[in-house]
């Protein structure tokens, strides 16, 4: 686990990052993807820009405390199918691996001080599942990992997809977040 912090667009993002052991990869990944899988500063830059985008777009909902804060802390773990299956079973009662899990700390009722660092929660991404999904969707792993991270972040910020309409809205926001970094 690596703890790292930096500013991104006037936001301070403190990230507890657990990289995926690249020696466990059974596919070739390009240097950008490899760097993303082991370098927390790449994620800090992305996550900071995504949060800032959400803050300045009034049409996008998130808890008031997030809108008024400039300091955030969260965890991001890149893991394997077994670990995410164990977490999915323990926390959600699902006996299957999944692509991404989010463990939010705040919600609309959260009361905090906006000049303090806001702990958002944790995002866990299964790299083997991301590899399979990237292949199935004719996408590259670089994009798929970011796609899953945006999905996890939106859950940390209060979004949910209990029906098709809310899922569609959430997926559109994910596309917007990736576009601001030029990934699509």
Curated annotation (Swiss-Prot):
Q: Which residues cross the membrane?
A: none
Q: Which UniProt keywords apply?
A: Cytoplasm, Endonuclease, Hydrolase, Metal-binding, Nuclease, Ribosome biogenesis, rRNA processing, Zinc
Residue positions binding Zn(2+): 151, 155, 161
Could you confirm whether the keyword Iron-sulfur appears in this record?
A: no
The record's section on PROSITE patterns has: UPF0054 (PS01306)
Alphabetical list of SUPFAM superfamilies matching this protein: Metalloproteases ('zincins'), catalytic domain
Q: Which GO terms describe its cellular component?
A: cytoplasm
According to its UniProt entry, one GO biological process term is: rRNA processing
Which terms in the Gene Ontology molecular function aspect does this entry carry? metalloendopeptidase activity; RNA endonuclease activity; zinc ion binding
| EC identifiers of the protein | 3.1.-.-
Coiled coil ranges: none
Task: Look up the record and name the cofactor or cofactors this protein needs.
Answer: Zn(2+)
The source's domain of life comes to Bacteria
Per the entry, the cofactor note is: Binds 1 zinc ion.
Q: Does the keyword Nuclease apply?
A: yes
Mostly located where?
cytoplasm
Q: Where in the cell is it found?
A: Cytoplasm
The record, for Gene3D superfamilies, names: Metalloproteases ('zincins'), catalytic domain
Q: Which InterPro entries match?
A: MetalPrtase_cat_dom_sf_prd, YbeY, YbeY_CS
* Primary role: Single strand-specific metallo-endoribonuclease involved in late-stage 70S ribosome quality control and in maturation of the 3' terminus of the 16S rRNA.
Q: Which family does it belong to?
A: Belongs to the endoribonuclease YbeY family.
What's the protein called, per UniProt? Endoribonuclease YbeY
Its source organism is Prochlorococcus marinus (strain NATL2A)
């Amino acid at each position: 686990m690596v703890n790292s912090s930096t500013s991104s667009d006037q936001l301070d993002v403190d990230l507890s990052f657990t990289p995926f052991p690249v020696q466990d990869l059974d596919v070739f990944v390009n240097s950008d993807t490899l760097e993303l899988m082991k370098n927390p500063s790449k994620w800090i830059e992305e996550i900071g820009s995504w949060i800032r985008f959400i803050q300045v777009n009034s049409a996008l909902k998130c808890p008031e405390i997030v809108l008024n804060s400039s300091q955030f802390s969260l965890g991001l773990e890149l893991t394997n199918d077994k670990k995410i299956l164990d977490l999915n079973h323990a926390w959600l009662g699902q006996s299957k691996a999944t692509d991404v899990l989010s463990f939010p700390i705040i919600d609309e009722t959260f009361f905090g001080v906006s000049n303090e660092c806001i702990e958002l929660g944790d995002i866990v991404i299964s790299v083997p599942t991301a590899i399979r999904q990237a292949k199935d969707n004719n996408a590259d792993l670089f994009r798929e990992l970011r796609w899953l991270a945006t999905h996890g972040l939106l859950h940390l910020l209060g979004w949910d997809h209990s029906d098709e309409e809310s899922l569609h809205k959430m997926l559109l926001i994910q596309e917007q977040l990736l576009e601001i970094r030029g990934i699509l």
